[in-house]
């Protein structure tokens, strides 16, 4: 919205500042943080009254989790409110990439909201049907992938690039839609599985958002992209503004989610944020780098896949409990130890992922 003011920059020179992505990214970050800080208490109180018993606690989970009973969920509403309001104010609304990323985020968030609603009303961890949920997610993701492919420059719009290698590019043609949809849905559900402890998911999400904000800015700049030998994708630099809003909203949410949490993110937030990260990775042609930067999310998802698959084949478990953060709790780590150590892992993986921009 503020980009409109640049039309008057010839007469009001200070309006030129809104042309700069870096300035608007900072503005988006501050705005979303303030929105969550200011409206957070009201939203939390409203959810606490409406939800009554709050998010149900797993009966087979660590004993320390039972003291969290009664904590409201759907905290993703706070996060998404901050992100959407901030993006409407600071982002260039003429960018197709901004709208695609927000569409996936809102769509996935709506699925998560319905899932949270069912869990709270039924007081059960059995929410939305898994198959139906995945089906709708893939539909949303496929539409987004098609839009991204059509918006890009041929032949690179449907190609897959690899980190650490300059010239290795594979044109997936129409299979790109299936691959991209898998990345978006996988990212959404991986973040969802990570969100099991106070503050565990939101900090790695912010770390990944900061990393991909940097990548988006470089990918959308012809000079930087040429220097780093990465694909130049015109228009993706605007996604840095969106991810700046994510960081700000994440900081605001962490204020209330810090242990002992006053509210949980819920599927509403985790699916929305994960889907957003996956979509940004697809738009910037850094899908594989997402698996590195978001390696913590991959680890959490793989632990569940391995646990379920191994149990079905042998009747035994690999981990004491999945996702893997619960395994470490069962091993005797305190919740704060698990959370902070996983944050450290997320930061290290982000640095490794960003190093792929130069190590080619």
Swiss-Prot record:
This enzyme's EC code(s): 2.7.8.13
Species whose genome carries this gene: Brucella ovis (strain ATCC 25840 / 63/290 / NCTC 10512)
GO BP of this protein: cell division; cell wall organization; peptidoglycan biosynthetic process; regulation of cell shape
Cofactors named for this entry: Mg(2+)
Residues that span the membrane, as ranges: 27-47, 71-91, 93-113, 128-148, 168-188, 199-219, 239-259, 262-282, 288-308, 337-357
Record localization: Cell inner membrane
Bilayer disposition of the protein: Multi-pass membrane protein
Keyword annotations of the record: Cell cycle, Cell division, Cell inner membrane, Cell membrane, Cell shape, Cell wall biogenesis/degradation, Magnesium, Membrane, Metal-binding, Peptidoglycan synthesis, Transferase, Transmembrane, Transmembrane helix
Protein name (database record): Phospho-N-acetylmuramoyl-pentapeptide-transferase
Assigned protein family: Belongs to the glycosyltransferase 4 family. MraY subfamily.
Function: Catalyzes the initial step of the lipid cycle reactions in the biosynthesis of the cell wall peptidoglycan: transfers peptidoglycan precursor phospho-MurNAc-pentapeptide from UDP-MurNAc-pentapeptide onto the lipid carrier undecaprenyl phosphate, yielding undecaprenyl-pyrophosphoryl-MurNAc-pentapeptide, known as lipid I.
CC annotations in GO: plasma membrane
GO MF, one annotated term: phospho-N-acetylmuramoyl-pentapeptide-transferase activity
Pathway field: Cell wall biogenesis; peptidoglycan biosynthesis
Alphabetical list of HAMAP family matching this protein: MraY
Catalytically driven reaction(s): UDP-N-acetyl-alpha-D-muramoyl-L-alanyl-gamma-D-glutamyl-meso-2,6-diaminopimeloyl-D-alanyl-D-alanine + di-trans,octa-cis-undecaprenyl phosphate = di-trans,octa-cis-undecaprenyl diphospho-N-acetyl-alpha-D-muramoyl-L-alanyl-D-glutamyl-meso-2,6-diaminopimeloyl-D-alanyl-D-alanine + UMP
């Amino acid at each position: 919205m503020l980009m409109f003011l640049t039309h008057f920059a010839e007469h009001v020179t200070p309006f030129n500042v809104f042309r700069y992505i870096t300035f608007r990214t900072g503005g988006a970050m501050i705005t979303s943080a303030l929105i969550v800080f200011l409206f957070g208490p009201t939203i939390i109180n409203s959810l606490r009254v409406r939800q009554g018993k709050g998010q149900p606690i797993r009966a087979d989970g660590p004993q320390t989790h039972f003291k969290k009973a009664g904590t409201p969920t759907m905290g993703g509403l706070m996060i998404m409110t901050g992100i959407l309001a901030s993006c409407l104010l600071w982002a260039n609304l003429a960018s197709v990439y901004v709208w695609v990323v927000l569409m996936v985020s809102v769509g996935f968030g709506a699925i998560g909201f319905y899932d949270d609603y069912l869990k709270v009303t039924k007081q059960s961890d059995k929410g939305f049907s898994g198959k139906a949920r995945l089906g709708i997610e893939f539909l949303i993701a496929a539409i987004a992938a098609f839009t991204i492919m059509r918006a890009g420059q041929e032949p690179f719009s449907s190609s897959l690039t690899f980190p650490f290698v300059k010239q290795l590019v594979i044109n997936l043609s129409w299979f790109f839609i299936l691959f991209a949809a898998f990345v978006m849905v996988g990212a959404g559900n991986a973040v969802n599985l990570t969100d099991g402890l106070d503050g565990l998911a939101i900090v790695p999400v912010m770390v990944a958002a900061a990393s991909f904000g940097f990548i988006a800015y470089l990918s959308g700049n012809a000079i930087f992209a040429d220097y780093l030998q990465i694909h130049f994708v015109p228009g993706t630099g605007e996604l840095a503004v969106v991810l700046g809003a994510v960081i700000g909203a994440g900081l605001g949410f962490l204020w209330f989610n810090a242990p002992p949490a006053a509210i949980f993110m819920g599927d509403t937030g985790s699916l929305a944020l994960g889907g957003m990260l996956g979509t940004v990775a697809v738009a910037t042609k850094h899908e594989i780098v997402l698996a590195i930067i978001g390696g913590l999310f991959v680890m959490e998802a793989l632990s569940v896949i391995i646990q379920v698959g191994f149990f079905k084949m042998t009747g035994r478990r690999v981990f004491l409990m999945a996702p893997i953060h619960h395994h470490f709790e069962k091993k005797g780590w305190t919740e704060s130890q698990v959370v902070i150590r996983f944050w450290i892992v997320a930061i290290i993986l982000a640095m490794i992922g960003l190093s792929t921009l130069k190590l080619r």
